[in-house]
């Protein structure tokens, strides 16, 4: 991460706006953030994966800020824990961000993409858990990405998955109603989900149990074979005796 420019700044940059958020919005972020952190770490990518932290982008004006539900700062250590980020101090613009669309759809569909593009963000995904296939204005996934022509809308779908170029995997919508969540999928077509930490631990436990059972079966088979050979030897001795 670039060195921060330290200078005296009398402006107060709040850590929170003291406004509540919908529980579903929080639950989606709480599941997705550690998934992205573990996935990027597994690929050897150095990045800071955060959630709902203010990113200030205009020195001297604390109203100029954005707080993505989940975001990735490439090249920034995960070991850092800050109250807010200030882009003029060397913090890079987010490589990736996901915003859960709330009742304030105008803010999410119009304002956030405009700000994200203005500050140099690379990829923004809007996830709208309340979107319906019949909706013309809302979609389950809306993707904005920076390319040769600038920051533009590149995909809008009611499907259950979109490809994230920034992360190198798929984003998958799972569950229904209050159980709607966003997961990562890591195969070519987005079918294989990247496991949560609990799922990974359970898979390791199951694999260890399978290995233990296989070893026990092999031991029992070896003992049975040894017993059979000993019996044959004893039978031969008896016949010769």
Labelled PLM ranges:
Residues 21, 26-38, 48:
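A structured, charge-rich N-terminal accessory region that forms the first stable segment of a protein
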Residues 28, 45-47, 68-69, 94:
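A generic secondary-structure signal marking the coil-to-beta-strand transition
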Residues 2-21, 38, 55-68, 73-119, ...:
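C-terminal interaction segment
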Residues 44-56:
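A short acidic/basic microdomain associated with nuclease active sites
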Residues 122:
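Short acidic/polar active-site loop segments enriched in Thr and Asp
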